Curated annotation (Swiss-Prot):
Origin organism lineage: Bacteria, Bacillati, Cyanobacteriota, Cyanophyceae, Nostocales
Domain 4Fe-4S ferredoxin-type: 18-47, 66-95
Stretches that traverse the bilayer: none
Cofactor(s) in the UniProt record: [4Fe-4S] cluster
The protein's name: Ferredoxin-3
SUPFAM superfamilies hit by this protein: 4Fe-4S ferredoxins
Gene name, Swiss-Prot/TrEMBL: fdxB
GO molecular function: 4 iron, 4 sulfur cluster binding; metal ion binding
Cofactor binding mode and count: Binds 2 [4Fe-4S] clusters.
Amino acid sequence: MATLTGLTFGGQVWTPQFVEAVNQDKCIGCGRCFKACGRNVLILQALNENGEFVEDEEGEEIERKVMSIIHPEYCIGCQACARACPKNCYTHSPLEHN
């Protein structure tokens, strides 16, 4: 398999690491990763006390909020989300082609 690579402005080989998962058990819902990502990959979602996703409206019982991946196809592999995350919630991997 071939791995997608690129070059930095300085000419060094760079392998983008694309977002795979967010550990929602570790996520504190601070939103730092959301602010760091300019590609609309992430969304902050509300969880009820049973750990189920619910609408973020006044009538719903919200236990906490966590980050979720809504558009993984928009990820450019920069890992800005992981660098901004204080709880190390992100898993990334290179893109491999057959």
